[in-house]
Amino acid sequence: MKSSYGSSSNDLHAFVNEIKGEIQLSNINLDPYSFVSPSAYDTAWLSMIEEDINVDDNELKPMFQGCLDWIMCNQNAREGFWMNSTSYTTVADGRDEDGEKDMCILTSTLACVVALQKWNIGCFHLHKGTRYIERNTEMIIGKYINEEGSYPRWFAIKFTGILELAQKLGLHFVFSSRCIEMIKGMFYQRQEIIQREKLVHDCNYKPLLAYLEVLPSKLYVTNQEDIIVKSLDSMDGSLFQSPSATASAFMLTRNTKCLAYLQNLVQKCPNGVPQKYPLNEDLIKLSMVNLIESTGLGEFFGIEIEHVLEQVYSRYEEKDFERMPMSYLADQLHKDSLAFRMLRMHGRDVSPRSFCWFLNDQETRNHLERNIDSFLLVILSVYRATDLMFPGEHDLQEAREYTRNLLEKRRSIKEKMIMHELSTPWIARLKHLDHRMWIEDKNSNVLSMEKASFLRLHSSYSDKLTHLAARNFEFQQAKYCRELEELTMWVKKWGLSDIGFGREKTTYCYFATVTSLPYEYAIKFGKLAAKTAILITIADDFFDEKGSFNDLEGLTKAVLRWEGEELKSYGNIIFRALDDIVRETANTCRTHHKTDIIVHLRNIWGETFESWLREAEWSKKGHTSSMDEYIRNGMISIAAHTIALSISCLMEPCFPHNKLKPGNYDSITTLLMIIPRLLNDLQSYQKEQEQGKMNSVLLHMKNHPGLEIEDSIAHIEKIIDSKRKEFLEHVLVDGLSDLPKPCKEIHMSCCKVFEMFFNKKNRYDSNTEMLHDIKKALYDPINVYELSEMEPMPLMAHGDEYMILPLLLNSLPNILEFKRKDGYGAMKTSMCFGRSYRVNKRVMASQLDDQHKPLKIVASQRKPVPMMQSIFAPCFY
């Protein structure tokens, strides 16, 4: 839905403090499992386990009463279904994600009503859940069948199996004849799956046995001990780390390892169990930190983020391959790659060996290749980690090529995110727009993919973080829009907006500046950086298009002397605006650092103007420079350092003055100058060839007769790739540069802007190419999904005037009524807290006298309709 948050800074910080109090990432006793979304389906299966099977039926009670309580308290009060989390989405199997959500809700609701039916409690919950199933099954299975007439594998297995169990327990559903035919088709599909697949298959990440809880017993009953017990995980006693499958395994075998696993699970997760256990606890915490940073909230949680990263780094080590079950390996690889990326981004010394161990194990690679859908998030995490590649890291290069190939094979799941990752390199993405994408992505809180659905961070945390991020984003938008208006007034004041030639890029420059910088820097210095970029654009166009050589020479000399009194027309306008920018920058530095840098700034600008004049002179004389000569001048004329150094001087701590002198720049600055120049050349060689100008691509082709233009482009791209890796290493590794970290961040932001401008095309020179991004960054309200309507059912769902009586659920009731409480003395209900309530009493309208007439009727008598012939409904056990 569209959101519009009119937050003030105080409102945001109050919300931040509220969330910090709940999340407590820096708490040393933090339980990571509190961040994981519970699974209604798996919790329902644990609730069905009997504590002791060697007792009479009327003495049976659940082993895990808390799981039954969770079901009673977590039904959607309005619609009657159960689900896992707010923005719940399932593994798409090549299908529409929202459709898969409906399928998962349907199977979860079926499991929950089966659990209530088994324990003969929660009549109102059971009634609402049954009604949801009857109302929605036809729509769900009819809408989401694929073109081949089949359903996702997991759904065909789970839906049919849980439906069989429901029938065995006496639950009957009223479906249309069309719906029944579709369900029959699903049973046929399941039969084909069973005939085609083995119970346990080394190549299948989730083999049939992972769905033990819903499999026909004939598949394993003759050799139950060998099939089930031997498949239990030697490390934890689970069946494929699936609580539901392990619950079924325990009910069938009463195996002590299963019991220990289940008891440990419930102790660790008392408020609903996740669909996978155990989980990598570092992965949970890193995923929470990743969500915070990726949605633009890192500025509020700096202490908490550093605490988590320091914890992870203290356990960091280079790993050689260690054999373990594939589900553990997948989590380990996901955690290791995410830790590598986050630790490297935060300046820690980490080696690619920490996660590239998988490259040397063919079995692991085979699993990844054969189960791309199941491991897609792991593959994506590895690919993202390779964004931060330093020179000589050949393992990272191999991992990048390998994972990119896998991602290109399977783009249907999280397609938008994958396409974004593959088409737009991380180095060419701007912070502010990336934050928006993560905020709007309903799958941003996903941890992993399991049997049927995404395992997610708990919605009670991720939803609040998402809405805080949305409010923060629109708060920033409002600030940026006001600043852009002020910047536009400045451009008009100095006559730059109607100068009559060149590119008018006020909005482009401001957009690129503030969306690339951290918000703290953007709001302090973004407008000044944009002024610098605007003037560079106009001056560059003046040298390229408008000015005579005498005009250009006169302006350059005026800048070198810093005396513009004799300038006229365009030269005068440019110099006066330049003088204003330099004075503002110098005054700001003097205020913050009590130091004068005006001479350094003038020298940097003088060097830039000289490089433009030199290019104009080469063009006028038809001079063909050497490659070295061209690069030495071109890396100055692109003027990336002019922007970066001007703003770096304002950072805290102050930029080293000796690094401001032309010819004595830091290695980071030098690399920043080279990369944008070559990026620009890749997109401008055709235009410059037509104008008779030189370019690194054209020079390389000229110096190597016989080469095609594609060969020269590939050569320049290779140089850029090498310089980019070197640049990243100098920015991210402490000790390779004397520059303070904030100054490195300014250089990184500046580089990312040029990478964005020249990613596959020249976006900066286009009048329309960036308009969509500008709208999203500065104007359009953010799109966020509604918070969940799932709320605990109140103890008395219909107020003090009514009570709800449990029904005899092994036969269909004629009528369900509410009767005045005083007619039953001290009788209590068990509606919300699912304690076993075993007094089964039906209240019929004919049994009531005039004094106790029913107050409300909720369901009337319906004739039970057999769903299908018994051949389609074999017993579960």
From Swiss-Prot:
EC number per UniProt: 4.2.3.144
Top-rank lineage group of the source organism: Eukaryota
Binding site for Mg(2+) 2: 540, 544
Summary of the knockout phenotype: No formation of (E,E)-geranyllinalool and TMMTT detected.
Amino acids binding Mg(2+) 1: 540, 544
Keyword Nucleotidyltransferase among record annotations: no
Membrane-spanning ranges: none
Entry-linked PANTHER family: (E,E)-GERANYLLINALOOL SYNTHASE (PTHR31739:SF25), ENT-COPALYL DIPHOSPHATE SYNTHASE, CHLOROPLASTIC (PTHR31739)
Entry's free-text remark on domains: The Asp-Asp-Xaa-Xaa-Asp/Glu (DDXXD/E) motif is important for the catalytic activity, presumably through binding to Mg(2+).
Function: Involved in the biosynthesis of homoterpenes, attractants of herbivores parasitoids and predators (e.g. predatory mites and parasitoid wasps). Involved in diterpene (C20) biosynthesis. Catalyzes the conversion of geranylgeranyl diphosphate to (E,E)-geranyllinalool, the precursor of the insect-induced volatile C16-homoterpene TMTT.
Protein name: (E,E)-geranyllinalool synthase
Organism listed in the record: Arabidopsis thaliana (Mouse-ear cress)
